[in-house]
From Swiss-Prot:
GO terms for molecular function: acyl-[acyl-carrier-protein]-UDP-N-acetylglucosamine O-acyltransferase activity. Belongs to the transferase hexapeptide repeat family. LpxA subfamily. It comes from Bartonella bacilliformis (strain ATCC 35685 / KC583 / Herrer 020/F12,63). The gene is lpxA. GO terms for biological process: lipid A biosynthetic process. One of its GO terms (cellular component) is cytoplasm. This is Acyl-[acyl-carrier-protein]--UDP-N-acetylglucosamine O-acyltransferase. Homotrimer. Pfam families: Acetyltransf_11 (PF13720), Hexapep (PF00132).
Length: 274
């Protein structure tokens, strides 16, 4: 624990593991199963509960509570965990829960993520790398979030929903269906409002690739054919485009929710069993 500083008012329980150059601020409470990586900074009134692992060089702001019991009535109190990657920024009042013993029992957060004030990550979620949750964004249990996703402020994501990489959810949206990679969803209930062009440009996609994605998505959500035929047509036409293949693979994986689709005139939803 070379270079580690613990404020006199902080309570670090016996068994907690602290790395080097860790800073524990006033009135923090670190549970006996917690593992705090090198270079982490916990400001005042931070609570780390249960089997929680915090990656190196992460910064936790006041009143964040990490590793709390899952809000799952089926949870029987088994040994479950929360893993948070390195270089994460977790702002004031954020809550993240451990996994539940009804499945794998792990909640996982990737590296280089930012969680703004009062964001919430429920039990058994898997959040990728470089993900941003704006203020008051929340996701239900068992949600999967791909890399480089942005979830706007005040937005809510239904349990078991999958969000593909580089997707964007507008503020104060309610996402109840799976959102394809690069997709942009807005509204209550959220609908697919095109592609996250800004995110694709940030990711370095060329104009030709973006045009291919736009055309592929328009083909996928043209309801003139069954979904399996549309997927086959898109893959046949764009098999050399990795970005399009990512979307095809996402759809073929078939999660437990339907897909987030464009707001057609008849407002139909595309079933993942189509």
């Amino acid at each position: 624990m070379s270079g580690t500083k613990i404020h006199p008012t902080a309570f670090v329980e016996e068994g907690a593991q602290l790395g080097e150059n860790v800073s524990i601020g006033p009135f923090c409470h670190i549970g006996p199963q917690a593992v705090i990586g090198d270079g982490c900074c916990l400001m005042s009134h931070v609570v780390i509960m249960g089997n929680t692992i915090l990656g190196a060089n992460s910064k936790i702001f006041p009143h964040a509570i990490l590793g709390g019991d899952p809000q799952n009535n089926k949870h029987k109190g088994g040994h479950t965990s929360l893993f948070i990657g390195k270089n994460c920024i977790i702002r004031e009042g954020v809550t993240m829960h451990r996994g539940s013993d009804t499945c794998a029992g792990k909640t996982v957060i990737g590296d280089n993520c930012q969680f703004f004030s009062y964001a919430h990550v429920a039990h058994d979620c898997h959040v990728g790398h470089h993900v941003t949750f704006a203020n008051n964004a929340m996701i239900g249990g068992h949600v999967t979030v791909g890399d480089y996703v942005i979830i706007g402020g005040g937005s809510a994501v239904h349990q078991f929903v999958r969000i593909g990489h580089h997707a964007f959810i507008g503020g104060v949206s309610a996402l109840v269906g799976d959102l394809i990679p690069y997709g942009m969803a807005v509204g209550v209930q959220a609908k697919l409002a095109g592609l996250n062009i800004i995110g694709m440009k940030r990711a370095g996609l060329e104009r030709k690739e973006i045009r291919s994605l736009r055309h592929a998505v328009s083909m996928l959500f043209d309801h003139s054919k069954p979904l399996r035929e549309r997927v086959y047509d898109v893959f046949s036409f764009y098999s050399t485009s990795q970005s399009v293949v990512d979307i095809v693979n996402f759809i073929q994986e078939k999660g437990k929710r339907f897909y987030c689709t464009p707001r057609f005139e008849n407002d139909t939803m595309c079933s993942n069993k189509d």
